[in-house]
Amino acid sequence: MSSKGQQLAIDYKQTEWKTPDVYNQLRGLMKDEVEIYAFCLEFLMNIEKDSTLFHSALSYVNEKDFSQLVKIAIDILKEKESAVAESVIEYAGIQLPHILHPYLDDLLVLNPNGDSYFADYHWRNCTSAQLQPYLAQFLASSTDLETKIKLFNCLVESRDITTIESLIPHALELELSTYVSSAHYIDGYLEGVGLCREYGKVKRYCSDQTYHILFEPKYLNKPSAVHLNRTDHPTWNGVPLTNKYKVGGYLAEDENNPFMHIITLNPIPEGLPIRLSQLVLGCHLRELNENGVVFYQHDEQGNPHKIGEPIVIEWVEEHAMVPTEVSIVPTDSRWAFQSWASANSRENLFRIGGEPSWVQSGEVLTCPISGEKMQFIMQLDSEVPDVQGGEVYYGSGGLCYIFWCDKTKVSGYIMQHT
């Protein structure tokens, strides 16, 4: 007799999304580690067509069982192509990259997920010792250019600064891209993984400490879309810190270009590179969506003052978020890195600290006063309710990224969307 999880996968194989109440059936398994693993195992072993239902389920598989799925997926890929097995590698690389580290050689040969943006995610957090053989292969004169480019991408994805600084002088001598210079290629790749070059050194532009912002469930949820329920995923849950933070509303109303309040950080969450006792973050969202970037300098009380005169925006009419209070929760290590596309609207991408979840490529702001690279401090997702009954969108529904220069007390905003 099949278990509930196994049976759901069997049913899905027959009728796919016509399976009665399929997502609610999956929701019923999410807190049962045995059943969610049974579902994923049956899906991996016996279903050829990949599915977001399977992707959703992987977030609830414990590390031990995920390691077993990885082993099976690699064995499958050694025998045949499998989009489902490739998804196991993709999501393990995002959530638990260390469980893939014993298979680095196999994965280089198999190259699951091909040239996709997430193909090398599993190299994240490899140690210098683990990387040494691959660095040596990259440096070897006998290694062909195509292999060197692949190894460069993998080694940078590790985020190991010692290895990367050994890599860069040699990478600069290669034709890494036919579209941009090698220097631009290197800088672009670094900024996509939380790093940047400044004054000849590689450094992180984001903090290690990460928090997720938690709203009251009814503030964000759309009851008609069960698969987008913003209470299920682990990133929408957790034990919050005691402090509450005010978000939304206006700092200054202007019919042409209102100054919208984002959040007041009081106190400043631990681990952020901010020496003020409080920081009021706000932006002219219409101008941000029209021009792509805005900057503010803050006074000693943390209040923002726009750098440059506000401009009249005629064609964009965004409104402020509905005022509310939010909590923050320290992020579990499994969710320290999140991919915007792979999250697929299931995960909480309202984050403070940590690495950005870039919609496009990395784009670290330079402070307009100090001329130095700024530190990433926060990101906001779209589809927050606004005061006019609509929703706040960054572009067509992307993310807003907030940067900070502590030397000059300047905040900067950019947004990316598809």
Residue ranges and their predicted role:
Residues 1-418:
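Preference for intrinsically disordered or flexible, low-complexity segments
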